[in-house]
Structure formats: C-alpha cells, structure tokens
Amino acid sequence: MGMWSIGAGAIGVAALALLLANTDMFLAKPEKAALEYLEDIDLKTLEKDAVTFKAKALWEKNGAVIMAVRRPGCFLCREEATDLSSLKPKLDELGVPLYAVVKEHIKNEVKDFQPYFKGEIFLDENKKFYGPQRRKMMFMGFVRLGVWQNFFRAWNGGFSGNLDGEGFILGGVFVMGPGKQGILLEHREKEFGDKVNLTSVLEAARKIRPQTSASEKQ
C-alpha cells in the first residue's frame, strides 16, 4: 500500500509539472525594445573584411523587416525564414527591405541558411536584438506541447537542420518604420518555433512611410 501511494504521488507530481510547463506561467516575459536601443546596436557585415555600422542604417530611409534568428541551423528557424521570404515580392513592391541578424558566425551556418532567407544577413555579436532582456528556453521547451506541434509542422514541411551553435536565446521579428516612425511590429518568440504572423508583418509594412530627402521635396 505504501509503495502504491508513493508511486501515485510521484505520477501526480510529474503530471502537475507537465501541466505547468505547458502554461505560460513560467515563461520569461519579454521587455519591449525602445527605438533608441535598437538604433544604437552595432552590426557587422559577414565578409572577411567586416564593416561595423549602427543598426538604424538598415531602416532609416525605407523602413525594414528584420528577423533575429535564434540559430541558423535550426530547422524551425529555417521554416520561419522561408515564410518571411515568401513576402519578399510584396515587400519589394512596398520598397521595404528584408534583413536578418544572427548572434554568431560559425562554420557554414549562415551560408547554409541563406537559401531559406531572401535578404541580407548581418552579425549581432553582442546579441542586442535578442534583448533588452535576453530570454532563454532551456529543456522545458521539450515538454511543451506547442513546441512538439511546431516540430512536427516543420518536419512535415520538409525542413531539416543541425545542432551547431547557441540555440536557447529566443529570437524575434521586427518591422521598423523609417526615421522616428518607430517600431511598427515587435514579435518575440515565446517558445521554439513560435512564428510571427505573416499577415501582421504585411499590415505593419504597409504603414511604413518612406523618408523623403530635401532634394525630393523641392
């Protein structure tokens, strides 16, 4: 009787832990980024003679859609990159560029990611686009039903990947307006494979008002 009671209690505790892991109760809440914070981020180009520049250069004239990639080798990230790239023709019509930032540049990870993403990619080695408060999903992610649904969705879509690089710091997607128009959309990944809504991305991109130079006004 005693062993049965202990066993039943252990099962109950495990069931409760599994239930709680599938709520948002213990997920780190994202801190909204200020425009000034994003503008001041240092980014690098990925060629051998890397050039460092401020992130605001990406959107100061025409706005931009920017993906902060959790890990280029992740098949879930490759799926989202493909989804965002499907918007490229419509973004081109709007004159809005599509970019991505990665937090590390190792092996051929970015090169192998490029076929999935139809925009330029830059290095954010200080991981600022993943802040101001960096959020991590550790092994709890593997007991979340939503994560497994995302896994199966990407697998069924034919996506594959690898385990190279840091993959616990969660990423996101931003739609930036030019100049001081500000952040028009900020999607913070809450769990592995939590993709941005593509309709919301396009709606935000359509709100972008390109900057006109003084010569164009005359």
Swiss-Prot record:
It is found in: Cytoplasm; Secreted. GO terms for molecular function: antioxidant activity. Residues 3-101 are annotated as: Thioredoxin fold. The keyword Membrane does not apply. The active site is at residues 74, 77. Belongs to the peroxiredoxin-like PRXL2 family. PRXL2A subfamily. This is Peroxiredoxin-like 2A.
